[in-house]
A protein has these predicted regions:
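Bacterial extracytoplasmic/cell-wall-associated proteins, especially those involved in peptidoglycan
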Residues: 1-144
């Protein structure tokens, strides 16, 4: 853990504890190294823009169960962990982040992305700054 660039936390506007919280979100959201650093950038961009993080894993954490598909009612759960309803980071980590997730949180990829979605069968995510592009991907996903 000492080999991590903890000095970057301040540059990102985060405390070390907030880095751990963010890394826990990355741990639950991104399966691949390339995606981890991009998810980290999305989180940082959304925090800076004061946008809701809208992380499904935080809703699952609030529900106390991991689900393949969340329902409309799930997204309305009143919990500080629900990043659809409450702005900013959740109050505590939602998982135990690994070193790769911590490093991603401290060294996010450069980019202006605000949205991401799993768009490939192997679980890789696509990233965009465009809400209309994000909606298009969701529609394609829903269509099968």
């Amino acid at each position: 853990m000492r080999s991590l660039p903890w000095g970057n936390a301040k540059k990102l506007g985060l405390t070390p504890y907030q880095v751990v919280i963010e890394a826990s979100l990355i741990e639950r959201e991104a399966a691949f190294p390339r995606d981890r650093v991009r998810v980290a950038r999305v989180l940082d961009n959304r925090l800076k823009a004061r946008m809701p993080l809208e992380i499904d894993a935080t809703v699952e954490y609030a529900l106390g169960t991991w689900k393949p598909v969340l329902t409309a009612a799930d997204y309305k759960i009143k919990s500080r962990y629900n990043t659809y309803l409450y702005p900013g980071l959740p109050p505590t980590p939602i998982a135990s982040p690994g070193l790769a997730a911590l490093r991603a949180a401290l060294e996010p990829a450069p980019g202006n992305w605000l949205y991401y979605l799993v768009t490939s069968k192997d679980g890789h995510e696509s990233f965009t700054a465009s809400y209309s592009q994000f909606l298009q991907w969701r529609a394609q996903q829903a269509a099968g």
